[in-house]
Curated annotation (Swiss-Prot):
Region spans: Disordered: 1-26
Protein role: Actin maturation protease that specifically mediates the cleavage of immature acetylated N-terminal actin, thereby contributing to actin maturation. Cleaves N-terminal acetylated methionine of immature cytoplasmic beta- and gamma-actin after translation. Cleaves N-terminal acetylated cysteine of muscle alpha-actin after canonical removal of N-terminal methionine.
GO CC term (a single one): cytoplasm
Catalytic residues of the enzyme: C93
Intracellular or extracellular location(s): Cytoplasm
Protein name as it appears in the record: Actin maturation protease
Length: 302
């Protein structure tokens, strides 16, 4: 008799048992790409950060770590307003910088990043979150913040330099497009790494003047009631205090370095041109939209 694996009891009853059903497949686990997962993690960190750790103390620590590079014969006069960090998702650097700038305008009603993005998309200023037009950035700020904005053209020197420094010493933000190096600092790539930063403050190296000294860092000081006006400061060196959407940290950039970077934005990155995505680039390209352009913001009541 041929061998069988059937249950004898089932054979006697004349019943043939069906094989057990196959096990269900394991549930699919959808993993975010590493860059997206990292971005979302740092965005969460930024949203829950304590201003005391991201503000003055962090900036002072950075200045102290770089103190050996500064001219020890100068007094270092710091103007800065705390600005919260926000990590961008995708090419949202300009809109994230705008959101950060809005925090310095004492707005009656906060404008969430999503509101800013939706406004930019609906008006045809952006497709992916990119902003290749400083003029559109100035108009967008008026619409979402209800503030005043001023578009500067012709670079960061000359008359514009005075306007930028006056803005920063008044505690108001400046948005600057520039080419971003791998450490997020300004570089010169002819616009291939175009990026946006918000400038929240300025560090002057000055010869003399009456200022309030920092209790912890020799040579670092702050403006006082009897400090000389900006026009009367004997300024020898200038650094800008910056934040941008790829880092939680403040950065300190030489004025001339970011000025040179801002003034050579002329081409769209060829990799971006061929990546299959749609981007909104103004007539005249990156050169017409960003090169040598800066945006200043003020509350309407100023």
């Amino acid at each position: 008799m041929p061998h069988t694996n059937e249950d004898p009891t089932a054979q006697q009853a004349g019943v043939i048992l069906d094989p057990p059903p196959p096990l269900p497949p394991p549930p699919q686990i959808h993993l975010l790409p590493p860059t997206v997962a990292k971005c979302k993690f740092f965005k969460k960190v930024a949203e829950n950060s304590d201003p005391s750790t991201g503000g003055c103390e962090e900036l002072k620590k950075m200045i102290k770590n770089r103190q050996s590079r500064f001219n020890g014969e100068l007094k270092w006069l710091l103007y800065n307003q705390y600005v919260p960090s926000l990590i961008q998702e995708g090419p949202q650097c300009g809109l994230v910088a705008l959101w950060m700038a809005g925090k310095l305008l004492n707005l009656a009603h906060e404008a969430p990043l999503q509101t800013i993005v939706e406004a930019a998309v609906s008006r045809g200023y952006t497709a992916q979150g990119e902003m290749f037009s400083a003029a559109n950035m100035a108009v967008l700020a008026k619409e979402v913040f209800g503030c005043r904005s001023e578009l500067l053209t012709g670079g960061m020197d000359g008359e514009n330099k005075g306007k930028i420094l006056q803005q920063l010493t008044s505690g108001l933000p400046v948005l600057i497009p520039y080419d971003e190096d791998f450490n997020h600092e300004p570089c010169q790539r002819e616009g291939h790494r175009a990026h946006w930063a918000v400038i929240s403050g300025v560090l002057f190296g000055v010869r003399c003047g009456s200022f309030s000294p920092d209790p912890d860092i020799p040579g670092l000081c702050y403006p006082s009631s009897d400090s000389p006006s900006l026009e009367d400061l004997n300024i020898q060196e200038i650094y800008l205090v910056a934040k941008q959407g790829k880092s939680l940290r403040y950065q300190l950039w030489e004025y001339d370095c970011i000025s040179r970077s801002n003034g050579q934005l002329i081409h769209l990155d060829p990799k971006r041109s061929n990546d299959g995505n749609v981007y909104i680039v103004p007539s005249g390209g990156v050169k017409a939209g960003l090169c040598g352009q800066i945006v200043l913001f003020q509350p309407k009541d100023v």
